[in-house]
């Protein structure tokens, strides 16, 4: 049996729409085994126990690339700790987990870069799948049908308070509210802030992250789909967050705080309780490792 662990990811990071993302330490864990025939699932809701399952589709994509005809397959979801449809890369974790598992069955035929190309073909953009695969903060673009990326290790000087609403928001729905065209001014606004965001993590200038987190392309439109967004977002800054942004397509809000700052999580939890906002709060560190096969299990 092959076991694979994949981290959650937070895409866009404010201004880096569809091009920036980072991995954090909450995980989905999968197990795969080739069997004599059939397709079996464990730990998967019944409606997803078929060939349309995103994990299976990713694995089949990898097998097809290798011209490998698998006899049968057992897919198990051992742990699903990444919240679903909350802007934390749950679907990307399934894609990456399936690809890494399939590649292990193939004996490691493909490199991680090749797996990334497959993941991007399946997902459509690299901002979640790249950090899920490589860990850290990844900046990625598509150039001539090839994914060009660079990984930045996130130091332990900051941590990430993940404020998770009690409702789902699909990426498809969140994209419907975005304008089809943007102004030059908004493009310039985001280019500068995306560059600043990257430089903040490279040079440890976390005091500049608040300005770097601002966005003109998606957040102001998507927040209308999220009750209490402005109140919680503003409260994060009031409580001392270094930066705050909508994670992925939402609805999760990500607050960046100093690693030595104590009390933020309890304070935001108390605020949510006082306002009767039934959202969860996770205090997470960055994951710089990315997806990996768990060794020593059978």
Swiss-Prot record:
One of its GO terms (cellular component) is cytoplasm. Its main location: cytoplasm. The keyword ATP-binding applies. It catalyses: L-homoserine + ATP = O-phospho-L-homoserine + ADP + H(+). The keyword Transferase applies. One of its GO terms (molecular function) is ATP binding. Pathway: Amino-acid biosynthesis; L-threonine biosynthesis; L-threonine from L-aspartate: step 4/5. It comes from the Bacteria. It is found in: Cytoplasm. Its EC number is 2.7.1.39. Gene3D superfamilies: 3.30.230.10, GHMP kinase, C-terminal domain. ATP binds at residues 83-93. GO terms for biological process: threonine biosynthetic process. Keywords: Amino-acid biosynthesis, ATP-binding, Cytoplasm, Kinase, Nucleotide-binding, Threonine biosynthesis, Transferase. Belongs to the GHMP kinase family. Homoserine kinase subfamily. Catalyzes the ATP-dependent phosphorylation of L-homoserine to L-homoserine phosphate. This is Homoserine kinase. It comes from Clostridium botulinum (strain Eklund 17B / Type B). The lineage of its organism: Bacteria, Bacillati, Bacillota, Clostridia, Eubacteriales. The gene is thrB.
């Amino acid at each position: 049996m092959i076991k694979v662990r994949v981290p959650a990811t937070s895409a866009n990071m404010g201004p880096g729409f569809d091009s920036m993302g980072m991995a954090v330490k909450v995980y989905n864990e999968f197990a795969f085994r080739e069997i004599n025939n059939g397709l079996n699932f464990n730990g998967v809701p019944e409606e997803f126990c078929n060939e349309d399952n995103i994990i299976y589709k990713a694995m089949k994509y990898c097998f097809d690339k290798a011209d490998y005809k698998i006899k049968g397959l057992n897919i198990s979801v051992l742990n699903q700790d990444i919240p679903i449809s909350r802007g934390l890369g749950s679907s990307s974790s399934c894609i990456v987990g399936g690809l890494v598992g399939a590649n292990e069955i193939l004996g490691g035929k493909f490199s991680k870069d090749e797996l990334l190309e497959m993941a991007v073909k399946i997902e459509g953009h690299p901002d979640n799948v790249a950090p899920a695969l490589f860990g850290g903060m990844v900046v990625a673009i598509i150039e001539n049908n090839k994914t060009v990326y660079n990984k930045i290790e996130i130091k332990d000087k900051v941590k990430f308070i993940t404020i998770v609403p009690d409702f789902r928001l699909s990426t498809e729905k969140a994209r419907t509210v975005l304008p089809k065209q943007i102004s030059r001014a908004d493009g310039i606004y985001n280019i500068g802030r995306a560059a600043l965001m990257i430089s903040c993590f490279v040079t440890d200038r976390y005091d500049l992250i608040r300005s770097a987190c601002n966005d003109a392309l998606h957040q102001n439109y998507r927040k209308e789909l999220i009750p209490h967004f402005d109140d919680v977002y503003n409260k994060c800054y009031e409580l001392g967050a270094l930066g705050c942004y909508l994670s992925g397509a939402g609805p999760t809000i990500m607050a960046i705080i100093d690693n030595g700052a104590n009390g933020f999580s309890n304070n935001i939890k108390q605020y949510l309780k006082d306002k009767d906002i039934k959202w969860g709060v996770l205090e997470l560190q960055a994951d710089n490792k990315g997806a990996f096969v768990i060794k020593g299990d059978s």
